[in-house]
Amino acid sequence: MATMEELQREINAHEGQLVIARQKVRDAEKQYEKDPDELNKRTLTDREGVAVSIQAKIDELKRQLADRIATGKNLGKEQDPTGVEPGDHLKERSMLSYGNVLDLNHLDIDEPTGQTADWLSIIVYLTSFVVPILLKALYMLTTRGRQTTKDNKGTRIRFKDDSSFEDVNGIRKPKHLYVSLPNAQSSMKAEEITPGRYRTAVCGLYPAQIKARQMISPVMSVIGFLALAKDWSDRIEQWLIEPCKLLPDTAAVSLLGGPATNRDYLRQRQVALGNMETKESKAIRQHAEAAGCSMIEDIESPSSIWVFAGAPDRCPPTCLFIAGIAELGAFFSILQDMRNTIMASKTVGTSEEKLRKKSSFYQSYLRRTQSMGIQLGQRIIVLFMVAWGKEAVDNFHLGDDMDPELRTLAQSLIDVKVKEISNQEPLKL
């Protein structure tokens, strides 16, 4: 007699056959609609018969499996009247009922979910592609990110583009870009590229190209990113020459012989980061430079703010040890939390429901970035917030409400029309 595992395997095999059989039926139906002759009719009838017989076999196997499960439950009850399952170490039954069996066979504990990515391997892989396919994939994972993830969740997708190809024995073959879209149970390899890792890497490698094409993630566009980025060179230069309250106000501190400035503070921060820079980080930058990537050198670079245009979930590894860059990303993540808090405050609901809508972009960014090897300079984030926080908030997109007078007029028209055609209470606009 077949075991339950064997029955389940047989059911799975037959279900695969059923999918193929149903596809053949659909193909035969299309052919019969095009050319309704006797041969096509007989083909359609035969294929429908095959699909019906496979379905009947599946139903029979499922019935056998259900009987086997029921028999096993009854045996368990007869063997132990206390209701304790065989193999359970308890002498008396727990107050809790038995739940699902969780299969751990697919897990690899040497590479647990959430481990630090192998950024060097990821950068080496990505720089083997031409820029057009990388930017198009970035667009699909930012502007169209939600739909792309929804349609392909739990799979490993391949991006293809005519610009990306390789020659194999003189034959031109497409070179696909692989990205994994994990679900909640997935365990990612260190070198595996997820949407978050992809955005992080590409944004750090090609900020100038992203700026030239104005490729801004919707997540960033709603927090006033463009307002801060449009005159970035002037804005950052103005900020750098401002007096810094975090340093002693003595002429000896400043390179220019005046009061200590924000530039002086970042200079000190850069020295500290230079001592912390890892071999992996140096290798990443060396490889990216050799590959011709347009990386930034410091926060004054014209495209430095564009490192965050694609909403990476941590500071890109190519600019992790550049003073002020990781903190600039943290500033944007706080703005995302601020906007979400404002939106939650607008919505109708209890305080508990609103609390559930609280955002944690900053905590996530902080945790991910610090796992890469640096501590964020919280004081620098404060300086950014004091300088640009109000301007950014004033440029938030908050789903602008209708003008009150216009809303009242539209609602009155709705009320009149609903009363004409129904005795129901009109809904609010």
Swiss-Prot record:
Q: What is the effect of changing Y178A?
A: No effect on RNA binding
Q: What is the effect of changing K189R?
A: Slightly decreased interaction with host SUMO1 and no effect on interaction with host UBE2I/UBC9
- Which top EC class is given? hydrolase
What GO molecular function annotation could you give as one example from this UniProt entry? RNA binding
Cell compartment(s), UniProt:
Virion; Host cytoplasm, Host perinuclear region; Host Golgi apparatus, Host cis-Golgi network
- Region (Interaction with host UBE2I/UBC9) residue ranges read 188-191
The region called Viral panhandle binding is annotated at: 1-175
Q: Where is this motif: YxxL?
A: 178-181
Swapping K189A leads to an effect described as: Decreased interaction with host UBE2I/UBC9 and SUMO1
Record flagged with keyword RNA-binding: yes
| Region described as RdRP binding | 1-50
Q: List the disulfide bonds.
A: none
Coiled coil stretches, renumbered: 4-31
Member of which family?
A: Belongs to the hantavirus nucleocapsid protein family.
Query: What is this protein's function per UniProt?
Result: Encapsidates the genome protecting it from nucleases. The encapsidated genomic RNA is termed the nucleocapsid (NC) and serves as template for transcription and replication. The nucleocapsid has a left-handed helical structure. As a trimer, specifically binds and acts as a chaperone to unwind the panhandle structure formed by the viral RNA (vRNA) termini. Involved in the transcription and replication initiation of vRNA by mediating primer annealing. Plays a role in cap snatching by sequestering capped RNAs in P bodies for use by the viral RdRp during transcription initiation.
Q: How does it assemble?
A: Homotrimer. Homomultimer. Homomultimerizes and binds to viral genomic RNA to form the nucleocapsid. Interacts with host MAP1LC3B; this interaction participates to the protection of Gn from virus-triggered autophagy. Interacts with host SNAP29; this interaction participates to the protection of glycoprotein N from virus-triggered autophagy. Interacts (via N-terminus) with host RPS19; this interaction probably mediates the loading of the 40S ribosomal subunit on viral capped mRNA during N-mediated translation initiation. Interacts with the viral RdRp. Interacts with host SUMO1.
In Swiss-Prot or TrEMBL terms, this protein is called Nucleoprotein
Origin species, per record, is: Hantaan virus (strain 76-118) (Korean hemorrhagic fever virus)
What's the name of its gene?
Answer: N
